[in-house]
Amino acid sequence: MYPYNNSNNNSPMPSARLPSRPRYGGGEEYPMQQVSFNNNSPPPPPFPSSPNDTGFYDGNDVQRPLLVNNGSTASSVTLNNGNGGNVRFTNAKSNMIGGGPDNVGIAPRKQTRRYKTIRRVKLTGGNLVLDNPVPSKYLQRVKRKDKEEFTHMRYTAATCDPADFERENYKLRQNLLGRETELFIVLTMYNEDEVLFCRTMNGVMKNVSHLCSRNRSSTWGPEGWKKVVVCIVSDGRTKIHPRTLSVLAAMGVYQEGMAKNIVEGKPVTAHIYEHTTQLSIDADMNFRGDEKGVVPVQILFCLKEKNQKKINSHRWFFQAFGPLLKPNVCVLIDVGTKPGGRSIYHLWKCFDINSNVAGACGEIKAMLGPGGVHLLNPLVASQNFEYKMSNILDKPLESVFGHISVLPGAFSAYRYEALQNDVNGHGPLEKYFLGEKMHGSDADIFTANMYLAEDRILCYELVAKKGAAWVLHYCSNAYGETDVPDTVAEFISQRRRWLNGSFFAGIYSMVHWSKVWSSNHNILRCIMFMFEDLYQLYNLIFSWFAIGNFYLVFYIMTTSINSVPNPPFAKNAGSVIHTVLNYLYVLLLIIQIIIAMGNRPQGYKWAYFMIIVFFAILMGYVLFCTAWITIEGVKTAVETAQHNQDAQFIALIKQNSFRDVIVSVCSTYIMYFVSSLLFLDPWHIFTSLIPYIFMSPSYINVLNIYAFCNTHDVSWGTKGDNGVSTDLGVVKSTKGKDGVHEVEVDLPTEQKDLNEQYEEACMALKVAPIPEVTKRDAKTKQEDYYKSFRTTLVTCWIISNLILVTIIINGQEVWQWFGDYEKRATVYLSFILWSVAGLSAIRFVGSILYLFMKIFTG
């Protein structure tokens, strides 16, 4: 407040003259005495925040703009108009709500809020809820202006924990309008740019348009958009990308200057913006409206004050908003994932026709670029093949069992009813949200790593829910496209969390295998779950010994090449090649362990790149040796039984090298091709199989080593985010004449300001962003070199694999009771190859059963 000027009868006067008119206004400066009052101008109608009316312009208050310049600081003047009303002049210097790096594009930070009005509003149930008109420039772009959900944006300052949202009397627009919610879609984001956000948001809006186009549906139709709510949860106000904020402003969802830091002495935990938008913006920053088939979409934008990780974002979705909307189906999408045009409908249909389905997921596709240009990168091609075969073999098999080990958080759906805890607060969501508290210091290392894959815990808790009989389903008709890592460092970092989380979560599900018997599943389903547990246990053991198994295959094949009747190399050349490769192999394994113990992949990008190249060359040599040994074995068998066709066939069958290799190859690569044809999606076989084969040794020797050597890394990067900011303003209440608590807030209400702000947001999207240069801070650099030593797990893993290798290849007498070297090598190689064949056969049979079930049950 300005101080009193005692030289003028103690009347409240500013100690300095008010700033000049803006350049577009013209005229003289405004001395305080020239202010005129007009109480007859009606205030703009607010959106009703409750049936009894809660937010309004007080009829005794007179709104007057304070003309400010760009360099002013926050201050205010209150004058009495002589009629019991007040005139408050506010001079506020406002900053963009979003933070983020300065070199990622210009957000509307220029001081366009020359006109701000102090508005006296009643608190809604003790909460700050504001309704503000959207810019008229925005309304010119859209068709419908008949209801306040289209013409006003609603802001709510949440000051509670997500679990207390309903108890603190917060309401959403859908509650006030009496609408039922069939689909509740959440988009979680951190600092993704406008391209990634628009890719996802535009895809979601296309799906809503498709739902409205289904005229013969009993659920959907032209007004189907009223049954869909899209919730955008951004993890941290200072983390959100400013250009993404510009997109939301251009869609009418977000307005700068509305948010506050503290309400009634309580820090704001989330800023909630609600608007029914009629505009969609694609990844090329093209605006699309009704003329492009865009239907209205109810948007709920939750901007969290602090960065508290993704699982906390899901708490806001499930615990804060879910109980108010009580949706039927919840869809989870990560910003950056583009859902197919009808994918959300197909996911919803799974729940509609199968009443026992608790969760479902679609296919995750790798984005390959225009004309598949990204497939030229072997790293992208190998991941494309991996994703495809997982969606053709693994997910269908698990869907047949009824338990999908993980529904990917990037694109999945859950039945809201199935997620609910029991009356004692125990259930799937309780176990799921425990992950929010599982920092390294708060839990043992096993539990902390397990909750790196909290979605796996949720999946198991759903199917094992006490007294229920829920199953999980894979929907092959639904898909979401996402970017995959295209650099070695990014790839290794991503897989570290995936591998560690899935490894420990897999152990959790097997340790708690008996929980399914307390569910309401029938005996047949429980037996199927037990079989799946055994299948997963076998795979888990295989993954534990994967590095030893691959080394043994390399060792046996490269030493056996010299013992065939017609070796490919001159005398001793094969032995020299084997010795060189063997020493390099062991040396690189040791180097990797040393690097992984104290460094991030970003610090040793070229070292990892050269290691991957070496393993690709090694794989090529192993394949050559395998092919040569097999061909020579066939020749020998044929020559042994030249004149008898039956004898030739029997000789081939008895030829160990031929039989085992052929069975293993047929059970993998031929099954890959056949199953892909059955799913009408074989193209990845031709474009990505070869890169996958040559990258497979790196999956085993590089990813596993880095993951196991970093089991201590369970941080989420949110430490220290405990302060309360006040840059947005503080709201305090006073009692009004009717005894109801009221607050005074300064808001941008003039259309001139709203339009200028809106134009700036749109103009910002037309300016190409400056390429972002990633920099490491001092703390990260220090953590790269100083990581604690995780002795027990890594030591056990290394020793167990060394024992396995030693037993097979060592020729000392101590191992003779296992048989001589050739016998041990032959038996073990046969075991490995037949195990691969058996696991592949199970996956293939599961894939076929899934297709049959899809035909008859949908």
From Swiss-Prot:
<dbReference type="InterPro" id="IPR004834">
    <property type="entry name" value="Chitin_synth_fun"/>
</dbReference>
<keyword id="KW-0812">Transmembrane</keyword>
<keyword id="KW-1133">Transmembrane helix</keyword>
<feature type="transmembrane region" description="Helical">
    <location>
        <begin position="609"/>
        <end position="629"/>
    </location>
</feature>
<feature type="transmembrane region" description="Helical">
    <location>
        <begin position="537"/>
        <end position="557"/>
    </location>
</feature>
<keyword id="KW-0808">Transferase</keyword>
<keyword id="KW-1003">Cell membrane</keyword>
<dbReference type="Pfam" id="PF13632">
    <property type="entry name" value="Glyco_trans_2_3"/>
</dbReference>
<dbReference type="InterPro" id="IPR029044">
    <property type="entry name" value="Nucleotide-diphossugar_trans"/>
</dbReference>
<dbReference type="GO" id="GO:0030428">
    <property type="term" value="C:cell septum"/>
</dbReference>
<feature type="transmembrane region" description="Helical">
    <location>
        <begin position="831"/>
        <end position="851"/>
    </location>
</feature>
<feature type="transmembrane region" description="Helical">
    <location>
        <begin position="791"/>
        <end position="811"/>
    </location>
</feature>
<dbReference type="InterPro" id="IPR013616">
    <property type="entry name" value="Chitin_synth_N"/>
</dbReference>
<feature type="transmembrane region" description="Helical">
    <location>
        <begin position="576"/>
        <end position="596"/>
    </location>
</feature>
<keyword id="KW-0472">Membrane</keyword>
<dbReference type="InterPro" id="IPR001173">
    <property type="entry name" value="Glyco_trans_2-like"/>
</dbReference>
<dbReference type="GO" id="GO:0006031">
    <property type="term" value="P:chitin biosynthetic process"/>
</dbReference>
<protein>
    <recommendedName>
        <fullName>Chitin synthase 1</fullName>
        <ecNumber>2.4.1.16</ecNumber>
    </recommendedName>
</protein>
<dbReference type="InterPro" id="IPR004835">
    <property type="entry name" value="Chitin_synth"/>
</dbReference>
<comment type="function">
    <text>Polymerizes chitin, a structural polymer of the cell wall and septum, by transferring the sugar moiety of UDP-GlcNAc to the non-reducing end of the growing chitin polymer.</text>
</comment>
<dbReference type="GO" id="GO:0071555">
    <property type="term" value="P:cell wall organization"/>
</dbReference>
<keyword id="KW-0961">Cell wall biogenesis/degradation</keyword>
<dbReference type="GO" id="GO:0004100">
    <property type="term" value="F:chitin synthase activity"/>
</dbReference>
<feature type="transmembrane region" description="Helical">
    <location>
        <begin position="685"/>
        <end position="707"/>
    </location>
</feature>
<dbReference type="GO" id="GO:0005886">
    <property type="term" value="C:plasma membrane"/>
</dbReference>
<keyword id="KW-0328">Glycosyltransferase</keyword>
<feature type="transmembrane region" description="Helical">
    <location>
        <begin position="661"/>
        <end position="680"/>
    </location>
</feature>
<feature type="region of interest" description="Disordered">
    <location>
        <begin position="1"/>
        <end position="63"/>
    </location>
</feature>
<feature type="compositionally biased region" description="Low complexity">
    <location>
        <begin position="1"/>
        <end position="15"/>
    </location>
</feature>
<comment type="similarity">
    <text>Belongs to the chitin synthase family.</text>
</comment>
<dbReference type="Pfam" id="PF01644">
    <property type="entry name" value="Chitin_synth_1"/>
</dbReference>
<dbReference type="Pfam" id="PF08407">
    <property type="entry name" value="Chitin_synth_1N"/>
</dbReference>
